[in-house]
Each structure stands twice: as C-alpha cells, then as structure tokens.
C-alpha cells in the first residue's frame, strides 16, 4: 500500500534474496542464527550486500540488548544479560562485519558492504551523517577484510542535501514514511539508485549487470 515502508532490496529487478530483518543489529542478526542460514546457502559467485548501523547503538545488556562495542577493532567484553542472567561476549561493530565478510569470501561469494542509509534528520540545515561512527567503522571493516565498500550514507545523503533544506522538510519527507528512518517506495528507489552509482565507481563485477 501507499504508506508501507520500503527497503532498497524491494526494488531490485535481478533475482534477489532479501534476508533483511527489521530491528536487528549485526550482533543480534548473528546471535539469532539468521546469518548461519545465509552462510550455508551461499554459492560461489553470489553477491552479498551487507549493511548494518541503524540498530547497532544503544543498550548492550539491558533493554533491547542489541548494541555492540563501538569501533572496528578486535575489542571484546563479557556482559551479563539483564533478561536472562546469562553471560555473553560482545565484540566491536566492525568485528561482526569482518566475520560476515570473511564468511562470504570463504564460500567463494563476493561481499559488498554498505554504510547505512541516511535518516531524515537535519542539524543547522545539514543532513545527519555517520562519517565518524558507523559509516567510518563500516569502511574500516570492509578495507581490513577486503570487501567492496559503497558509502551509501554519503551518496544518498548528498542527494537529500541537494534538495535543499531551505525548501523545508516537505520535499525530503516524501522519501520517508512515518518516521525519520524508514523510507517510502520513492526513498527505496533513490537508495537503490545510489547503490548502482556506488557500484559503477568500483571494479565489482556486479556492475556489469547494471543498465
């Protein structure tokens, strides 16, 4: 329907398996066994787009308990989970991304890592960026593990910024639905085009499928 939130994976034309799950961080995506299903199904030559960051801040062992340690290094820490009383080793955000990348490469598939999509949030007329946090850590993880990296936050963020904050949020707002994070179909198409733009700037063979 018209008001349904749409993700960028909803608007591809090539055969795509969309395994995204709302509300998951890199850590909880792994903990829930969702990544294992992808790993075991991977075939040589598959392309795997990996994006996290929207749900990776916040509480580590209380509340939603889905955050990771900040950064892209090998840091880890043991936490006692409030809900279960069990203990869990939590790693850095970048550690989880590097694991996903290495798993994909182990299967002969091609990892493509994306910084997360921009939110409809402005500060003094400038759209919010993630260049000093999750976007930075995503880039670092991709470079460290040898994956293709697309700075989707910058590419789509630049497009939204160019629409002009001074026009008001009405124009930019049409790319989002009921909140500042989830995009409309129009926003999903914009982000998909941004991925295509980013792919064209790489030597990733997936770009050969683009029109």
Task: Describe the residue ranges of each PLM region.
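Short glycine/serine/threonine-biased micro-segments
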Residues: 7, 18-21, 51, 185
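Catalytic nucleophile-elbow at a beta strand-turn-alpha helix junction centered on a G-D-S/GDSL motif
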Residues: 5-6, 25-26, 55-57
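N-terminal hydrophobic targeting/anchoring segments and the immediately downstream early-domain regions
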Residues: 10-15, 44
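Alpha-helical cap/lid subdomain in secreted, periplasmic
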Residues: 37-182, 189, 193-211
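N-terminal post-signal-peptidase region of extra-cytosolic proteins
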Residues: 25-37
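Single conserved hydrophobic/aromatic residue that forms the stacking wall/gate
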Residues: 1-12
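A short beta-strand-loop structural module common to alpha/beta enzyme folds
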Residues: 13-25
């Amino acid at each position: 329907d018209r008001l349904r939130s749409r993700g960028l994976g909803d608007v591809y034309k090539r055969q795509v398996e969309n395994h995204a799950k709302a509300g998951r961080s890199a850590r909880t995506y792994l903990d829930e066994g969702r990544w294992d299903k992808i790993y075991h199904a991977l075939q040589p030559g598959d392309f795997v787009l990996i994006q996290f960051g929207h749900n990776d801040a916040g509480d580590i062992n209380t509340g939603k308990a889905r955050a990771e340690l900040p950064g892209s290094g090998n840091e880890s820490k043991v936490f006692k989970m409030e809900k279960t009383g069990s203990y869990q080793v939590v790693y850095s955000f970048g550690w989880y991304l590097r694991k996903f990348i290495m798993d994909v490469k182990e299967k002969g598939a091609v990892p493509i890592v994306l910084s997360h999509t921009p939110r409809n949030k402005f500060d003094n007329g400038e759209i919010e960026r993630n260049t000093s946090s999750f976007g930075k850590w995503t880039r670092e993880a991709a470079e460290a593990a040898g994956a293709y990296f697309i700075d989707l936050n910058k590419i789509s963020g630049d497009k939204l910024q160019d629409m002009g904050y001074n026009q008001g949020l009405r124009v930019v707002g049409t790319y989002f639905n009921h909140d500042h994070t989830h995009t409309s179909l129009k926003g999903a198409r914009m982000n998909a085009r941004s991925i295509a733009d980013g792919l064209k700037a790489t030597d990733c063979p997936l770009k050969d499928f683009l029109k």
